[in-house]
Amino acid sequence: MLSPKRTRFRKQHRGRLKGISSRGNRICFGRYALQTLEPAWITSRQIEAGRRAMTRNVRRGGKIWVRIFPDKPVTVRPAETRMGSGKGSPEYWVAVVKPGKILYEMGGVPENIARKAISIAASKMPIKTQFIISE
């Protein structure tokens, strides 16, 4: 699973998901890509599940690029804990994703194989996505 090696601070504010993605919204490396249509937090487990699904489907050929990285810690309080006594401890990492962001890219495979592999990865995501091809 992906997570930062070290961070400046252990805990972060939740923030809010406003607007559309201005960076990371164009295909840079491959020919085919999976693009988000909704804002969300995508966990490192979901990113890894999508990546594994794609690599299994493509097998030998092709190359896959993961364009997002989970750099936001999410804290969780223990079950049945009273209110107060500070913020919970960091439990897992998420990538903050806005509409238009590219999640995965793929190259070196025919379109039908890429479409199939990316659709399987899309089913692992908690949001609506679309398959795009670079011009």
From Swiss-Prot:
Pfam families: Ribosomal_L16
Keyword list, A-Z: Chloroplast, Plastid, Ribonucleoprotein, Ribosomal protein
The protein's name in its UniProt record: Large ribosomal subunit protein uL16c
Gene Ontology cellular component terms for the protein in this record: chloroplast; chloroplast envelope; chloroplast stroma; plastid; ribonucleoprotein complex; ribosome
GO BP field: translation
NCBIfam families, alphabetized: rplP_bact
GO MF term list: mRNA binding; rRNA binding; structural constituent of ribosome
Any coiled-coil regions, as ranges: none
HAMAP family per record: Ribosomal_uL16 (MF_01342)
Signal peptide: none
Gene: rpl16
Subunit architecture: Part of the 50S ribosomal subunit.
Family annotation (CDD domains): Ribosomal_L16_L10e
Family membership: Belongs to the universal ribosomal protein uL16 family.
Main location as per UniProt: plastid
Subcellular location field: Plastid, Chloroplast
